[in-house]
Swiss-Prot record:
UniProt keyword DNA-binding present: no
Cofactor(s) of this protein: Mg(2+)
Keyword Transmembrane helix in annotation: no
InterPro entries assigned: G_ENGB_dom, GTP-bd, GTP-bd_ribosome_bio_YsxC, P-loop_NTPase
Residues at which GTP binds: 30-37, 57-61, 75-78, 142-145, 174-176
Residue span, EngB-type G domain: 22-195
Name this polypeptide is given: Probable GTP-binding protein EngB
Pfam family, one: MMR_HSR1
Record function comment: Necessary for normal cell division and for the maintenance of normal septation.
Length: 198
């Protein structure tokens, strides 16, 4: 899809701060430093729309981005960062659960995992959480450029089996460096949101 407009609308922590809009929403989740910000910047053709932090666990709000006036991307704070305090982790959990369980505009989630490594227990927990609430999920297996092409299928199998990916949920091979998987990611997003691939 050709992205002509992408703007941050609001950074929210509670429902009354969410945008008052009927547009479909896609939530983007992933472990801290997995490459989620790079994924968002790449598929939106923006270099610095989402700041890429060298400090894991930096995003502590739900960041709503308006894309082409037709949908919202919701950047969810990264999980699994050990140095976050228990109280911060509890606040994160409550904020995420509130959004995922109450937001009617939410059509699907994107879960970003690192293709090079077996998904962590936190990745499994996040996927199970999404499935518990019956949220359709697209899995983005990023950093594919760091692995020889001949080993992609082997690594994909590990991702699929570790997460126990349900039928209907797509896995997209992706690279923020080369742009691999960009079109496939958009196709999956349009399918989930029933928007047109303009």
């Amino acid at each position: 899809m050709k992205v002509t407009k992408a703007d941050i609308v609001i950074s929210a922590v509670k429902p009354e701060q969410y945008p008052d809009s009927d547009l479909p929403e896609i939530a983007l989740a992933g472990r801290s430093n997995v490459g989620k910000s790079s994924f968002i910047n790449k598929i939106l053709n923006r270099k610095k729309l989402v700041r890429i932090s060298s400090k894991p666990g930096k995003t502590q709000t739900l960041n709503f981005f308006l894309i082409n006036e037709m949908m919202h991307f919701v950047d969810v704070p990264g999980y699994g960062y050990a140095k976050v305090s228990k109280s911060e982790r509890a606040a994160w959990g409550k904020m995420i659960e509130t959004y995922f369980t109450t937001r009617k505009q939410l059509d699907a989630a994107v879960l970003v995992v690192d293709l090079r490594h077996q998904p962590t227990s936190d990745d499994v927990m996040m996927y199970d959480f999404l499935k518990h609430y019956e949220i359709p999920t697209i899995i983005i297996a990023t950093k594919a450029d760091k692995i020889p092409k001949g080993k992609w299928q082997k690594h994909l199998k590990v991702v699929k089996e570790t997460l126990a990916v349900e039928i209907g949920d797509e896995i997209v091979l992706f690279s923020s460096e080369t742009g691999l998987g960009k079109e496939e990611a958009w196709k999956a997003i349009h399918k989930m949101t029933k928007t047109k691939n303009a």
